[in-house]
């Protein structure tokens, strides 16, 4: 129902996920070829040179560890590796969530330019993501509060675009939008 969401996939939709992998690989190839044909190295330069707006794509994988032992795990991992290496320059971004940092393969995690952590029960999990910054141990447990590691570590606040006095009201208000 969200106009900016092309599709959503569930873990048990093996055929749909395999089709998604093929489609995204083709899209990555198409975008790389497009940039090459115009002699530019990034989607921003392509837009500047051609005046055309190639849309930005964001792919979200919630709970990375949940795909472990699924028949498509290897192919999906290869796709995520490719996006993490090539995606930024061609306008394809990858967001992956995991309950613990060590649930992500280091090979993939090392390609992430930005990392974000919400409050964790184990402070070492926070430090593993953002480093030994004092912010890691003083992070307030406020809904939507997070630490984001870019060049430096910043405190960020996320908010839902709806009002509500409790979680149920917020969820219902989100559904009504």
Which residues does each predicted region cover?
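P-loop NTPase catalytic phosphate-binding loop
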Residues: 1-41, 51-124, 137-138, 177
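Long, structured protein-protein interaction/assembly regions in large complexes
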Residues: 45-47
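Conserved P-loop NTPase motor module
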Residues: 68-70, 77-78, 114, 143-177
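Phosphate/diphosphate-binding loops
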Residues: 124-150
């Amino acid at each position: 129902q969200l106009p900016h969401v092309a599709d959503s996939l569930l873990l048990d939709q093996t055929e749909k996920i395999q089709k998604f992998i093929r489609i995204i690989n083709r899209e990555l190839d198409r975008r790389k070829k497009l940039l090459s044909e115009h002699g530019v190295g990034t989607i921003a330069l392509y837009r500047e040179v051609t005046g055309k707006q190639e849309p930005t794509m964001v792919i979200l994988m919630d709970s990375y560890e949940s795909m472990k032992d699924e028949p498509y795990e290897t192919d999906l991992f290869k796709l995520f590796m490719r996006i993490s290496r090539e995606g930024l320059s061609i306008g394809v971004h990858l967001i992956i969530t995991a309950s613990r940092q060590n649930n992500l393969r280091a090979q993939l995690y090392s390609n992430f330019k930005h990392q974000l952590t919400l409050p964790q029960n184990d402070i070492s999990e926070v430090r593993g993501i953002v480093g030994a910054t004092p912010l890691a141990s003083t992070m307030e447990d406020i809904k939507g509060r997070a630490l984001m590691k870019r060049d430096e570590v910043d405190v960020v606040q996320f908010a839902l675009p709806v009002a509500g006095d409790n979680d149920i009201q917020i969820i219902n208000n989100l559904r009504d939008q």
